[in-house]
Swiss-Prot record:
Its EC number is 6.1.1.23. It comes from Bacillus anthracis (strain CDC 684 / NRRL 3495). One of its GO terms (biological process) is aspartyl-tRNA aminoacylation. Residues 200-203 are annotated as: Aspartate. The record marks G84 as: Important for tRNA non-discrimination. This is Aspartate--tRNA(Asp/Asn) ligase. PROSITE patterns: AA_TRNA_LIGASE_II. Coiled coil: none annotated. ATP binds at R222, D223, E224, Q231, E484, G536, L537, D538, R539. Homodimer. It catalyses: tRNA(Asx) + L-aspartate + ATP = L-aspartyl-tRNA(Asx) + AMP + diphosphate.
Amino acid sequence: MAERTHACGKVTVEAVGQTVQLKGWVQKRRDLGGLIFIDLRDRTGIVQVVFNPETSKEALEVAETIRSEYVLHVEGTVVERGEGAINDNMATGRIEVQATKVSVLNAAKTTPIIIADDTDASEDVRLKYRYLDLRRPVMFNTFKMRHDVTKTIRNFLDTEEFLEVETPILTKSTPEGARDYLVPSRVHDGEFYALPQSPQLFKQLLMVGGFERYYQVARCFRDEDLRADRQPEFTQIDIEASFLTQDEILDMMERMMTKVMKDAKGVEVSAPFPRMKYADAMARYGSDKPDTRFEMELTDLSEFAAGCGFKVFTSAVESGGQVKAINAKGAASKYSRKDIDALTEFVKVYGAKGLAWLKVEEDGLKGPIAKFFGEEDASVLKNTLEATAGDLLLFVADKKSVVADSLGALRLRLGKELELIDESKFNFLWVTDWPLLEYDEDADRYFAAHHPFTMPFREDVELLETAPEKARAQAYDLVLNGYELGGGSLRIYERDVQEKMFKALGFSQEEAQEQFGFLLEAFEYGTPPHGGIALGLDRLVMLLAGRTNLRDTIAFPKTASASCLLTEAPSPVAEAQLEELNLKLNVKEEK
């Protein structure tokens, strides 16, 4: 078999007159009665191959048997297309290959999906036949983007003198965070490994070990409920460094991300990135990962609401809640009563009891609650919300968390429906100064907002024992266009501070020692100040490639129920395997 001389998508007018050897798949076959045209595809693109009896009767005879997705080896001569046949929409559109020889390297059945960017196959079918789905150019381009992103990050971190170090996949189960995937040990009867949710503790121990600068393209595993931007196994760019301040870490990540954007996406973004405190993000956008590509911020009306004539507003404030509003500029005429009812049902998903609304007209406010506001109150409302005729005002009165969640989600929905979002923009943002702990009323205990190893502000360390809910974390999240790309923090590196953190989280001394004794002991041997960040590679590629689903950025992903339609994993195992592990199944029967 002759060696391939050209990739299909790279045969250009410079090759006219040359004999070429091409290998690839049949994208399309057209029989024009005496002439057969085949679009031959490989990962670089498509080239048109012509089978003409005047050039080779033998090649034409073979071409008559060829169907879509056959794998071919074609030998032929490159010629220029005639004036009427030029296609400037494709890189090879000015030439074609006159076939002199063709051999079928492999035949193909009729494929269950169309191998094209605009395939009509359902996602389940695409996942079941993932190896066919991956042939689509849009999929290859996505994974080329992923490769370019990873390569750029590796090159950047190499210039910054980071070492790439692999950490264990079989590790210890810890109680914090999502559920672990457990792996039974055959050697240690009744004991289990866990697959890592992140390399957090190992990368900190590498700092104890004096490595100073570490990174890893790390596989991570979390047994949690899934959604469009989550997978049970995912990849993160894991970074840790000693002796750097928070500002130094953020500056380095900005330099890295601007290089990624330029080298992998061809987009210039400016640094430094804007920074916003967590409290400000929640107050202004109702989100800890605000999409800053459009305005429409939340306005706090609690002070006004406390003294207004609308009881729903006043009672919300009196019970410790708040009233906030969104002004959808110029949207009054775009939303009917039925449309607003749909918005009301939407915010109820986020816990809101309802959605109050007003339309601003030239002669005043109109809507179901307009009668509760006198002329003076109406004027205050309009001035506070900077409202003018044609605006739609939307209000939620409830607990602070419900107001933030519901209006934050409503803001994003309105931004999309009103086409306020500039899809060409890439808006990076740092969200800083997070709460260290969050209180869970159902569990009646505190949980770490990020993880238990996050360093509090020095002046807040004592609050861990007196008022844990007031302690602030030296933590930072990187946000891009309303998506959390990753999070990081400075880490606790002193045993006494770590023990205070564990105590605030409800650990007894015995529990802390049992779970994390190795880390606490390590802190007694001269641990340097350190910090880092973990960036979600899958999500970053999803955003840069313009995809809407994480599954499109992972070669062989799982479904929303964490199953693989291709291999049918998870699956039962042989009884002998269970016996070897001394395991017995106790599967509950479905009623």
